[in-house]
């Protein structure tokens, strides 16, 4: 399955919620009618079965983190093997992706932009360049912008934008040095209440 390259707002309208695929310079409800389905007049959303609700939740989370279907299923399998709550383990694995950590630290305005920084070798982990977006960041790892990439206007713009967002408590960021520390894995209470991971577990448990 190829990565989706179409209109980002269309995906948010399909899921009926902001997937944070755009930079956030303007509120998403000023860009499109988020409550309406895609299409000129917004097709009426059908009443979903239990399976349909579970599938939509999985698609929503997968799109938020920019993960392909096969990758997402593999994350679920790994989450199920780990001790503890499978749903919470799944979210922790997704949050631990390098592209997501770069976004959370404010170095990228969106996860897609953060992923691009990683693939363009602009990101270092503990002083070494890592260009794999799915790389799992571990507690106490230091993530930083390479010296030659610090002058990029998009990085500076992203950091300014990040000042308007709530700062994650599991990260410690020095915006001046353009580096941050992944202090710990986020707990469920740290993350969005708009995600219902239990529906995803129910979907894959069938």
UniProtKB/Swiss-Prot annotation:
Keywords of the record: Antibiotic resistance, Ribonucleoprotein, Ribosomal protein, RNA-binding, rRNA-binding
Record SMART domains: Ribosomal_S4, S4
Tagged with keyword Protease: no
Ranges of residues in domain S4 RNA-binding: 96-156
Pfam families for this protein: Ribosomal_S4 (PF00163), S4 (PF01479)
GO cellular component, one term: small ribosomal subunit
SUPFAM superfamilies, sorted: Alpha-L RNA-binding motif
Cited Gene3D superfamilies: Ribosomal Protein S4 Delta 41, Chain A, domain 1, RNA-binding S4 domain
Outcome when changing residue 200 to N: Confers streptomycin independence on streptomycin-dependent S12 mutant P91D. A RAM mutant
InterPro entries from the UniProt entry: Ribosomal_uS4, Ribosomal_uS4_bac-type, Ribosomal_uS4_CS, Ribosomal_uS4_N, S4_RNA-bd, S4_RNA-bd_sf
PANTHER family: 30S 40S RIBOSOMAL PROTEIN, SMALL RIBOSOMAL SUBUNIT PROTEIN US4M
Protein name: Small ribosomal subunit protein uS4
Organism: Salmonella typhimurium (strain LT2 / SGSC1412 / ATCC 700720)
Gene: rpsD
């Amino acid at each position: 399955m190829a990565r989706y390259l179409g209109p980002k707002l269309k995906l948010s309208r399909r899921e009926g919620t902001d997937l944070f695929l755009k930079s956030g310079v303007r509120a998403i409800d000023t860009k499109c009618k988020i409550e309406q389905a895609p299409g000129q007049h917004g097709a009426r959303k059908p009443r979903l079965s239990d399976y349909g609700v579970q599938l939509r939740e999985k698609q929503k989370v997968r799109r938020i983190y920019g993960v392909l279907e096969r990758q997402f299923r593999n994350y679920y399998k790994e989450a199920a093997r780990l001790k503890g709550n499978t749903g919470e383990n799944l979210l922790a694995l997704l949050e631990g992706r390098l592209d997501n950590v770069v976004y959370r630290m404010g170095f990228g305005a969106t996860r897609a932009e953060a992923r691009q920084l990683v693939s363009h070798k602009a990101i270092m982990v503990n002083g070494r360049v890592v260009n794999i977006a799915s790389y799992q960041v571990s507690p106490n790892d230091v993530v930083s912008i390479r010296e030659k990439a610090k002058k990029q206007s998009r990085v500076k713009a992203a950091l300014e934008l990040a000042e308007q967002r709530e700062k994650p408590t599991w990260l410690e960021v020095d915006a001046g040095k353009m580096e941050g520390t992944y202090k710990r894995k986020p707990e469920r209470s740290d993350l969005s209440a708009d995600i219902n991971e239990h529906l995803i577990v129910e979907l894959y448990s069938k």
